[in-house]
């Protein structure tokens, strides 16, 4: 009985230590989530501005007789048969965040199966150790991969990564580029986001209001202007996806650690009850043995 009590005490101590760790991780994730949210807010302001500039210049150029759809960035899907698709996806470098990573991985796997059934080839470009590890373990080839970027979003590195997919699209190597990530919805939920990155859809860059920009004069550089803006638009979408994913990751981890802490608390209560019961039984047994010994001596 004594050894049983010792085992229960060890378990209680172990669970309490785990609970301390999960509580600490929750606090860290809460702090990091706030920082990621601030990054996302600042980025949204920039996103609105670049979208407005993009749309206004595109509209003014079209008024001068240039159709944006002539640009390879805007090539309509129905005018270009889809034979090869690049899927760019973001996962975290770490786990302990519930189903955050598996949600993205499942969607990428689903898209692969869907395109395969249509005889469309798919290439994967992965950001994040969890996604890289999963597809590597399952012997699925990754055309491009990078770690430590999802944990520390950097515009230059994000642009460098996505520009490889953009170049292949412009050169006709691929016919479509899809961006998949698990994004931030609110403090307690995440939202799977699947975006057709290329070709750019006209409705994806509708500006809410005019910026009152100067007129764009007709010139041979019109397409170059629009293409440069399109390139920046793609780069920023990649960068924002990293920030959005980071906020969602910390939100998911905060929830997971909160749930783990609560579960640990319940387990400690259960083990404490078991310990007290075992201790009471041990005391009762000792009393019975003492009484039996006393009776035998009479």
UniProtKB/Swiss-Prot annotation:
One of its GO terms (molecular function) is proton-transporting ATP synthase activity, rotational mechanism. InterPro entries: ATP_synth_F1_ATPase_gsu (IPR035968), ATP_synth_F1_gsu (IPR000131). Transmembrane segments: none annotated. It is a peripheral membrane protein. Keywords: ATP synthesis, Cell inner membrane, Cell membrane, CF(1), Hydrogen ion transport, Ion transport, Membrane, Transport. GO terms for cellular component: plasma membrane; proton-transporting ATP synthase complex. GO terms for biological process: proton motive force-driven plasma membrane ATP synthesis. It comes from the Bacteria. Gene3D superfamilies: 3.40.1380.10, ATP synthase, gamma subunit, helix hairpin domain. It is found in: Cell inner membrane. The keyword Ion transport applies. F-type ATPases have 2 components, CF(1) - the catalytic core - and CF(0) - the membrane proton channel. CF(1) has five subunits: alpha(3), beta(3), gamma(1), delta(1), epsilon(1). CF(0) has three main subunits: a, b and c. Produces ATP from ADP in the presence of a proton gradient across the membrane. The gamma chain is believed to be important in regulating ATPase activity and the flow of protons through the CF(0) complex. Belongs to the ATPase gamma chain family. PANTHER family: ATP SYNTHASE GAMMA CHAIN, ATP SYNTHASE SUBUNIT GAMMA, MITOCHONDRIAL. This is ATP synthase gamma chain. The gene is atpG.
């Amino acid at each position: 009985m004594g050894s049983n009590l010792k085992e229960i005490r060890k378990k209680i101590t172990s669970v309490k230590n785990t609970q301390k760790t999960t509580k600490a991780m929750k606090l860290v994730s809460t702090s990091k989530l706030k920082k990621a949210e601030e990054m996302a807010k600042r980025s949204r302001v920039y996103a609105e501005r670049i979208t407005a500039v993009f749309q206004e210049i595109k509209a003014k150029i079209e008024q001068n007789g240039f159709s944006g759809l002539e640009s390879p960035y805007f090539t309509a899907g129905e005018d270009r048969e889809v034979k090869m698709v690049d899927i760019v996806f973001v996962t975290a470098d770490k786990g302990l965040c519930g189903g955050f990573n598996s949600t993205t991985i499942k969607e990428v796997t689903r898209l692969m199966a869907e395109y395969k059934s249509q005889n469309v080839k798919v290439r994967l470009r992965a950001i994040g150790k969890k996604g890289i590890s999963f597809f590597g373990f399952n012997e699925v080839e990754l055309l491009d991969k990078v770690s430590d970027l999802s944990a520390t979003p950097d515009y230059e590195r994000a642009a460098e990564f996505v520009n490889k997919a953009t170049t292949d699209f412009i050169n006709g190597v691929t016919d479509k580029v899809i961006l998949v990530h698990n994004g931030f919805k609110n403090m307690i939920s995440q939202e799977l986001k699947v975006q057709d990155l290329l070709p750019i859809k006209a409705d994806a860059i509708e500006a809410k209001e005019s910026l009152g920009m100067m007129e764009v004069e007709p010139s041979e550089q019109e397409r170059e202007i629009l293409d440069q803006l399109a390139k920046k638009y793609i780069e920023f979408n990649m960068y924002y996806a990293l920030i959005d994913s980071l906020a969602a990751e910390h939100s998911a981890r905060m929830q997971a650690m909160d749930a783990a802490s609560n579960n640990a608390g319940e387990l400690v209560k259960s083990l404490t009850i078991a310990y007290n019961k075992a201790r009471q039984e041990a005391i009762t047994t000792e009393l019975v043995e003492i009484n039996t010994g006393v009776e035998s001596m009479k």
